[in-house]
Amino acid sequence: MFDAKLTHTVEDFAALLLPLSENDLEREWRWKDHDEEGIRFACFVTLQELRHLAVTLATLRPKLTPAQHILSQYHAAYMDLQAALLGLSREDAERVPAEGEWSVRQAYSHILGTDIGFTSVVRYALESHRAGFWKPARMSDEDEMRIIGMSEEEYKTLTGGPLDGMLAYHRGFHPTIIEEFSKIKDKELDLPSTFWEETRFPIQHRLYRYEAYFTQHTIQIDKTLVAIGQAPSESKRLIRKIYAALAEAEGMMIGAEKIDDTAILGTASSILERTREIEGLLR
């Protein structure tokens, strides 16, 4: 679904730019007629290319279904969180900003656990409705473990483990959710589902909750990073914008079974060439 070459190319560009100081960003770099803003301007060129790619892809595919559109919003929130955590050491991930507050690792554990929980609720509701036996009762613990594909012990090991382990798991789990739920039909969005609340919210509500929940706790993590002395540098702020643009372009790939990848590969090649050029300047 998502293009691995494009994703990895943007990640490599981000990894190169992340440690740069403001002085580094001002080092000479030229793009066409722009020769006064230095390496910093490479971020803006990359941003524009990714935004243009999103616009181009929108013209090459059928209109996003409502479910696919909601999932693209969720994907944008996921990517924003990933960008916020770039460059964070394991030691800093464990630092608590104040007594009684969560470390970044604890906050991410909560996000991942809830992501898994939301997914189990939607999967169970779809499974039950499609089989014609949906009931308003909550799923059993056995059904929940079956649906998430891990035992309770495995779940606790994952969410109680180091941040890098959770990030690695999430990188595989997230696109699986997108791919699976991109096939939800419009009429299924209004079907009821059961979680901890008394209200049997429709599946559509559950899908919207992904983005809302990520946003809530990404802000929490942003505040924590500032409190532990890890406020974002200019480079990281620029990279976060680039990840947002990548997310928009990838959002246009959701549910697109056949799409001309010429524009995708062209954008990836352009960013790769720019990365190599800047690498040469920094040596």
Go through each PLM region and give its residues.
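A short, structured beta-strand-centered segment in the mid-to-C-terminal lobe
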Residues: 2-6, 154-172
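A short small-residue
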Residues: 58, 149-158
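Hydrophobic alpha-helical core bundles mediating ligand binding, dimerization, or RNAP-core interactions
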Residues: 10-13, 74, 78-81, 122, ...
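Short alpha-helical functional segments enriched in proximate histidine and acidic residues
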Residues: 16, 84, 114, 118-121, ...
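Short, contiguous alpha-helical
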Residues: 1-7, 11, 26-71, 94-148, ...
